């Protein structure tokens, strides 16, 4: 292991695993447990949705907390929120509690992610960030595969309550890693002011209007991709197992490229992955509208896997590069809000386009938005590796 990775193994990489796997497990456990407690499908959907709402609502306050109290303190506070939510899931049996708990869970997740981004910005040089962030993104992809499987298996054998307690215990391990190894950064004890955030947004309006829009587009395309492939597979009459195979092949290609993407960013610049991946993304999403059988869907899914893998870490890396040292927390809070909006906009765009037209129209619509975003990346997003 190189010195680049040794320095962040305990404060960054291990907590990413200890929090990432439970976070992915919760995505399947929460709705299923709500159903088991007697809640309906609407209640289960609302609980999952409120977790996402909690993430967006907490983005800017988390940035303000990081600016005032420091990244380490914010990460520790966030893990207390997350672990407490997991533990309380196991202790309550009224569905009404889960609305509040899911919101707190989401707020804690957002706060931790922001604290980690800010910590990496301070702890890693610009020529290290691409690889470090790509490693984190790779661990998130691994967690997305392992988390639901492990969570479902545990729930089957030991029950939901004990499973949530296991998730809370895993978060404790992440807490200990950060508490014992993360470097304290001097906090800024100025009062937290919303006016300071709005002033920052105005001061960096050019950055948010270019690189910010590019990042929104990346997140929108990624989120839309996860919805479009299975929906189109169902539209073509493919069996569930066949659709799963298509998604899995795309995911394997994606995972294989996460670290090479980080190396390219650190050696040749951020645009070296941002420009080609955005163009590939837009073209492949539009090409989904032409897929009419298993082989054509698989071919497009492979290209989407390449695009997603090549773009690994680009959004977080751009954010850390562009964040001003003196206002890092507030800037990253605004940055995360933009990216969360992009993630939410992807499925909503697909839903609206399908309602008004068809799944093919949805693919074309997202592809067109991606093309506009790739133009912004090519024409207006400057190289941030200095």
Describe the function of each predicted region.
Residues 1-6, 183-211:
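Juxtamembrane intracellular "pre-TM" segments in multi-pass secondary transporters
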Residues 5-52, 209, 222-232, 236:
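Helix-loop boundary and gating motifs at the non-cytosolic
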Residues 103-140, 318:
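Cytoplasmic helix-loop-helix junction between adjacent transmembrane helices
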Residues 58-70, 258-269, 354:
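Helix-to-loop junctions at the C-terminal end of transmembrane segments
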Residues 38, 70, 91-93, 269, ...:
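Helix-breaking motifs and short loop linkers at transmembrane-helix boundaries and internal kinks
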Residues 74-87, 168, 272-286:
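Structural signature of the two symmetry-related core transmembrane helices
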Residues 169-188, 373-381:
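C-terminal membrane-cytosol helix-exit motif in multi-pass small-molecule transporters
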Residues 23, 104-116, 303-315:
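Core transmembrane helices of Major Facilitator Superfamily
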């Amino acid at each position: 292991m190189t010195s680049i990775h040794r320095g962040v193994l305990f404060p960054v990489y291990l907590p990413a695993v200890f929090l990432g796997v439970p976070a992915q497990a919760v995505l399947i456990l929460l709705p299923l447990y709500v159903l088991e407690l007697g809640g309906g499908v609407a209640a289960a959907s609302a609980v999952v949705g409120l977790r996402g709402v909690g993430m967006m609502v907490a983005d800017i306050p988390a940035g303000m907390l990081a600016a005032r109290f420091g990244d380490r303190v914010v990460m520790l506070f966030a893990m207390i929120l997350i672990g407490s939510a997991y533990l309380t899931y196991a202790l309550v049996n009224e569905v009404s509690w889960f609305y509040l708990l899911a919101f707190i869970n989401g707020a804690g997740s957002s706060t931790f992610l922001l604290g980690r981004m800010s910590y990496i910005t301070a702890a890693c040089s610009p020529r290290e960030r691409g690889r470090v962030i790509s490693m984190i993104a790779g661990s998130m992809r691994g967690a997305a595969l392992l988390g639901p499987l492990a969570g479902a298996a545990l729930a089957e054998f030991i029950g939901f309550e004990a499973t949530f307690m296991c998730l809370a215990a895993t978060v404790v391990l992440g807490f200990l890693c950060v508490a014992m190894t993360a470097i304290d950064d001097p906090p800024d004890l100025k009062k937290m002011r919303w006016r300071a955030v709005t002033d920052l947004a105005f001061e960096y309006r050019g950055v948010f209007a270019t690189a910010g829009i590019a990042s929104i587009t990346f997140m929108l395309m990624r989120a839309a991709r996860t919805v479009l492939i299975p929906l189109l597979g169902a539209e073509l009459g493919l069996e569930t197992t066949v659709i799963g195979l298509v998604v899995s092949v795309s995911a394997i290609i994606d995972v294989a490229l996460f670290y090479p993407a980080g190396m390219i960013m650190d050696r040749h610049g951020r645009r070296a992955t941002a420009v080609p991946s955005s163009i590939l993304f837009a073209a492949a999403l539009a090409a989904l509208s032409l897929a009419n059988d298993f082989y054509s869907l698989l071919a497009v899914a492979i290209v989407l896997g390449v695009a997603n893998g090549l773009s690994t870490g680009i959004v977080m890396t751009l954010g850390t590069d562009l964040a001003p040292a003196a206002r890092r927390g507030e800037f990253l809070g605004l940055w995360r809000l933009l990216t969360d909006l992009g993630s939410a906009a992807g499925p909503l765009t697909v839903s609206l386009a399908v309602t008004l037209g068809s799944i093919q129209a949805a693919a074309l619509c997202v592809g067109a938005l991606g093309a506009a975003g790739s133009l912004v990346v090519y024409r207006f997003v400057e190289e941030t590796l200095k």
